[in-house]
């Protein structure tokens, strides 16, 4: 995914005419950049090391984190009685927030986003579930190894039936 995303970002950058922007793929837990290097670091759906990011940001630089919250896809997790952060006491967003504050960031906003996505077909929803860790049973609090379980057909069909709307399956 990352190489393709960078390719798309570079195409968009070319169209924008801006010259002071570059994109890189790297391990966010082993960043290979000097201190005070970035104006902006973004992280989406990933584990972050806020202390390392803090060191790589220029003075006045910004960090934007968009992560999966405990309540993301909650109705699905409830139906299957498992899933990413299902058993966690703290939501992932709060875990990240505390780590960011501990790293030295001063102006921090925690803005919960809860988006309802709709899928045209049950095949589309199923494809998402087998490619993402939504129903994988693991804890964001303890970072334990997660267990990939098969998606039970009967439970999946029940979910589809209960969550099909005129907009699609939510």
Residue ranges and their predicted role:
Residues 48-64:
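A short glycine-rich, Lys/Arg-flanked "PGG" loop and its adjoining helix->strand segment in the class I
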Residues 106-170:
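Conserved Class I S-adenosyl-L-methionine
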Residues 62-94:
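Conserved class I S-adenosyl-L-methionine
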Residues 1-31:
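Class I SAM-dependent methyltransferase SAM/SAH-binding core
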Residues 41-42:
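Hydrophobic beta-strand segment of the Class I
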């Amino acid at each position: 995914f990352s190489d393709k995303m960078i390719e798309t970002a570079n195409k968009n950058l070319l169209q924008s005419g801006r010259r002071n922007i570059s994109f890189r793929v790297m391990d966010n837990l082993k960043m290979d950049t000097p201190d005070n290097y970035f104006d902006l670091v973004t992280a989406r759906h990933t584990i972050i090391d806020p202390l390392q990011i803090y060191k790589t940001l220029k003075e006045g630089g910004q960090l934007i984190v968009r992560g999966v919250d405990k309540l993301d896809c909650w109705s699905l997790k409830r139906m299957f009685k498992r899933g990413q952060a299902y058993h966690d006491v703290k939501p992932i967003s709060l875990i990240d927030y505390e780590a960011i504050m501990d790293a030295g960031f001063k102006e921090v906003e925690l803005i919960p986003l809860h988006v309802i996505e709709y899928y045209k077909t049950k095949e589309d929803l199923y494809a998402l579930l087998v490619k993402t860790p939504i129903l994988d049973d693991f804890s964001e609090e303890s970072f334990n190894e997660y267990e990939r379980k098969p998606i039970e057909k009967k439970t999946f069909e029940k979910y589809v039936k209960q969550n099909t709307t005129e907009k699609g399956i939510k």
